[in-house]
UniProtKB/Swiss-Prot annotation:
Disulfide bonds: none annotated. This is Putative coiled-coil domain-containing protein 196. Residues 135-198 are annotated as: Disordered. It comes from the Eukaryota. Residues 187-198 have a biased composition (Polar residues). Keywords: Coiled coil. Residues 24-117 form a coiled coil. Residues 135-144, 154-167 have a biased composition (Basic and acidic residues).
Amino acid sequence: MTSASNSPESYLSSKTRSSKLDDNYLKELNEDLKLRKQELLEILKPLEDKNNLLFQKLMSNLEEKQRSLQIMRQIMAGKGNDDSSVIELIKEAEEMKQNLERKNKMLRKEMEMLWNKTFNTEEFSDEEKVLQIKNKTDLQDGKAPKTPSSSRKTKNELETLCAEKGKEIRKRLFLPPGKETEENGMGQVSGTSQHHSE
């Protein structure tokens, strides 16, 4: 009987100690999330006008992560030692985790598509500007202007060049180091080569 009366006190003191440690850990995680939020703001600032929707999704995603951390804190604290409320909180945290994982996958795909599109259009417009300047200088030097067929050929070469540069960037951004994909198709997206088994 005496051992039974002593155990709740020792259990509570050890629980208090562990919840303090857990709370410190969760505070560190929260600080880390704030830093990541700030980094995202800086990364996405130049693209903010074009990518407002994506930006909002990323921010709401981070806010959801912070809410899940608050739930974790409540679980760790044991909120009034009521097991049923702790179980409910655990279920809620699990649902939130699965939801966040789904959202993260979708966001990664959207960001990859958006970056590819932005990069390709910017590269293409830069190359066209260079060509226009070159044509003007050729005319001033007395050289014959390019025929429509040759300019079409140049445009195709530019598109090929943009596609290849886009592939290189996708590899650097989304593939783990050392993982090379062998792609010979002109406009092939990296995602399609990875899922060819499906």
